[in-house]
């Protein structure tokens, strides 16, 4: 495959054109009065969105050099989304401004390496400043962060705040599409495993077709049980104690399952059995989680424990257990809080060391189940187009809220970046040469871009707003909704510090890379050939008729031998 190779300023200008095309489409969505973008879909109705990352991912340009520039901005947006969950439009606007100013200076003769160094030093200083000014988030502020990120939707803010309150910051909150028109919150308390009862004969509530136990013993084992002799000692001990029993095992089959069903039917013992969740090593880890949560032990031959050795103290206790045909939910107080915390810390360490997105997701689920619950926000809307847009907004709001809990909050609406620009002047005195100072100035000017864009999108002159905000106190900024200058923290217009930090770091990183690019190598697109002449083509096919002569080489010819 042939390649196109471009050098020097020409290569950088090609990248800039692609960057500007994508960034201009993304920036119009910024702020509470941001405009919508309509995306054509190959199949189905067009999608109307107000979400920067969705717009960015959907753009592919015809010119391969420009498309490479667009991909760089997609990378900025995606990286910011991965780290902080929100702030993709802010990162895009910052990167576009830094690249534009930087390329002007490089074209005028500035040393791109020194300029890049100046950008990196300035961004590093500003990141420390953001961490210094961030305030911890609590109470009402959680709902306010979610409301701002959801485009001013107070109902979404309240729902996310309620979900975080119920499942804690370690819990899992998921967003799903609902078949109804309303948006609702469902919270599952305790640990839920995706395994239901092994036999419908275990059901205790015939109307709801569920098994309900209270203060039941839980036998947890990684063994496959097929002989009833393995279970007899356990069943006798539980029956004498007058308690219900839940058995979680790799599998229970044949004689063992049949005997449990008969005992349940005769009223000898209130019992139910479910298969262990997961597979392989993950299954053992999840069984150990259940054991720690319920205050029991995992009965495994690997640690020298067999079913004959089990007594009541080795079993867990479930304060409330509910089992349907698909899921088992255990609410337990049996485990000590200290042991559960240790287990969560251990899983969190594994989470930090893992490179696999799938493994990370499963480890996060395990933390949530140990921490106390899963909340599901079911999103409803009148049309599919509105539903998709609303779901994207809620996901953004949820990610922003998690980021705020992690690293705290700062005044929103681009205000923090404006006030931080004064720190750049202080830094310039410590920089080694004039070209590094140019890098610092590039960042300082870029810090104005987010507020400028938010104001422009709301129909007011951005440059006027920027100058006015620059002269106010740190927490005072421009409220686009009311058109007033006020204390944004008091007004509930907040940004997660992690979002602002990640947007700035990723924008600075990509700007430095573009400025120091001296050559771009891309694949040369294949020219689409002209449509073939149908008459000529068909005539050629006619020649295939000669193949009919091959018949003469067949069996009759062989007869001549």
Curated annotation (Swiss-Prot):
Root EC class: isomerase
Enzyme Commission code(s) on record: 5.6.1.7
Gene Ontology CC entries for this record: cytoplasm
Catalytic activity: ATP + H2O + a folded polypeptide = ADP + phosphate + an unfolded polypeptide
Similarity section: Belongs to the chaperonin (HSP60) family.
Subunit architecture: Forms a cylinder of 14 subunits composed of two heptameric rings stacked back-to-back. Interacts with the co-chaperonin GroES.
Listed name of the protein: Chaperonin GroEL 1
UniProt source species: Trichodesmium erythraeum (strain IMS101)
